[in-house]
A protein has these predicted regions:
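Hydrophobic (often cysteine-bearing) scaffold residues that line and stabilize catalytic clefts
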Residues: 16, 20, 40, 44, ...
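A short, basic/aromatic helix-end/turn motif that makes direct DNA contacts
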Residues: 169-175
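Hydrophobic residues embedded in beta-strands of well-ordered beta-sheets
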Residues: 180-182
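Basic, Lys/Arg- and aromatic-enriched nucleic-acid-binding interface segment
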Residues: 90-92, 105, 109-164, 168, ...
Length: 213
């Protein structure tokens, strides 16, 4: 029997007779999972736990075997996840799909009942600012000393096209003043990115470092 080694324990490659809970456990000890950011790992674990505990036709979804779980079961589970909202239900489908496909690529199974879940579409929740609105915000933030930190966060997010949350947790160690570059790890994808800092933003960062660094 094949195994994958983890720092915590050795995990056997599941069989088609294994339960869904074993498929999830196998994924949680994979390099694919470990490559995610710490926040994403925590979110995946939380939602996968809910998925396994979802009652479908009198049984917990996690107790279904790989060969017995059908599209009917995954769609019924999805309907229950919708109680928590469309976005949450779709997120749970996505994380379950990641776990399922990890084993599927190792020929544990050849069917994909997760892919057959009929999802509902969500309404876009992102509000897009115009360039003028961003500049107006920055003028206001930089015009008041107590708001300057907020202005810098938004300024960096705008210039680097990165998530505001990632900008908020940057430290001075992420800023390479001599190379005029910011080095960071994206929270969502876990990717390392290295971005040039424009002159005007660099000037503001130097001032902030002098005042608070």
């Amino acid at each position: 029997m094949g195994v994958l080694e983890s720092e915590e324990k050795v995990v056997d490659i599941p069989k088609h007779t294994s339960k869904l809970s074993a498929i999830v456990d196998f994924y949680l000890h994979s390099n694919n999972f470990r490559s995610l950011s710490a926040k994403s790992q925590k979110d995946y674990e939380k939602h996968l736990d809910v998925i396994l505990k979802t009652n479908v036709e009198g049984r917990l979804l996690g107790n279904y075997t790989v060969r017995s779980i059908k599209a009917r079961h995954t769609n019924l589970a999805y309907e229950k996840w919708l109680v928590s909202g469309v976005r949450t239900a779709n997120y749970r489908k996505a994380v379950l799909s990641a776990a399922w496909k990890y084993s599927m690529r190792l020929d544990v199974m050849d069917n994909d009942p997760v892919r057959l879940i009929k999802t509902k579409s969500t309404k876009p929740r992102k509000v897009k600012w115009t360039r003028d609105q961003v500049l107006c915000f920055l003028d206001t933030a930089y015009g008041n000393f107590k708001w300057r930190s907020i202005g810098l966060i938004v300024h960096m997010a705008y210039e680097f096209a990165q998530r505001v949350g990632d900008m908020r947790i940057l430290t001075w160690d992420n800023i390479n003043f001599s190379e005029q570059r910011v080095d960071l790890t994206q929270s969502k994808r876990g990717a390392d990115v290295h971005l040039p800092i424009p002159d005007d933003l660099l000037s503001m960062l130097r001032q902030q470092s002098q005042d608070f660094g």
